[in-house]
Amino acid sequence: MAEAKALPRFKKLYQDNIRKALLEEFKYDNEMQIPRITKVVLNMGVGEATGDSKKPAVAAEDLAMIAGQKAVVTRARNSIATFKLREGMPIGAKVTLRQDRMYEFLDRLITIALPRVRDFRGLNPKSFDGRGNYAMGIKEHIVFPEINYDKVDQIWGMDIIVCTTAKTDDEARSFLRAFNFPFRQ
């Protein structure tokens, strides 16, 4: 008989507590109006890729270890002569997380990775895009426990975008605050 797969901690938190709290706070007419996280996108741009084409592949490996899912190498859409960049050159890596992997990543990000960031004073509460999505940047990818610090030859930054179905920034802010996102006061 197949074992029942354990529900990720953040998904259980969302289903049991956050949905009810948001329904009371914003007084939605329909349960489908309650915001939910649709996806989390991790992006790592590698600026030195123009000089060494192997760097985006290494960044993709690191990103795959962080996300638990294979990363896609991104390529330049058009040529820029001042950056010595040609169309089609590999310049970074990205991963889109959905469903359980997304909740597991957010759990690791908030409970383990963000507290390990040097001089961390909280996330910027103004980094919403006006449509309920939140974007943040991390300067060092070594804050994640999956990355072995001794084997890293170069430290890269990364962008993390949390896409939600919230209609406004205020809805999204209180929604993410319920997940214990450490926003600055």
Swiss-Prot record:
GO biological process: translation
InterPro entries, per the entry: Ribosomal_uL5 (IPR002132), Ribosomal_uL5_bac-type (IPR020930), Ribosomal_uL5_C (IPR031309), Ribosomal_uL5_CS (IPR020929), Ribosomal_uL5_dom_sf (IPR022803), Ribosomal_uL5_N (IPR031310)
SUPFAM superfamilies tied to this protein: RL5-like
Keywords tagged on the record: Ribonucleoprotein, Ribosomal protein, RNA-binding, rRNA-binding, tRNA-binding
Cellular component GO terms held in the UniProt record: ribonucleoprotein complex; ribosome
Domain of life: Bacteria
Alphabetized GO MF terms: rRNA binding; structural constituent of ribosome; tRNA binding
Residue spans crossing the bilayer: none
UniProt similarity note: Belongs to the universal ribosomal protein uL5 family.
Function comment: This is one of the proteins that bind and probably mediate the attachment of the 5S RNA into the large ribosomal subunit, where it forms part of the central protuberance. In the 70S ribosome it contacts protein S13 of the 30S subunit (bridge B1b), connecting the 2 subunits; this bridge is implicated in subunit movement. Contacts the P site tRNA; the 5S rRNA and some of its associated proteins might help stabilize positioning of ribosome-bound tRNAs.
Subunit structure, interactors included: Part of the 50S ribosomal subunit; part of the 5S rRNA/L5/L18/L25 subcomplex. Contacts the 5S rRNA and the P site tRNA. Forms a bridge to the 30S subunit in the 70S ribosome.
PANTHER family: 60S RIBOSOMAL PROTEIN L11-RELATED
Protein name stated in the entry: Large ribosomal subunit protein uL5
Provenance organism: Brucella abortus (strain 2308)
Gene: rplE
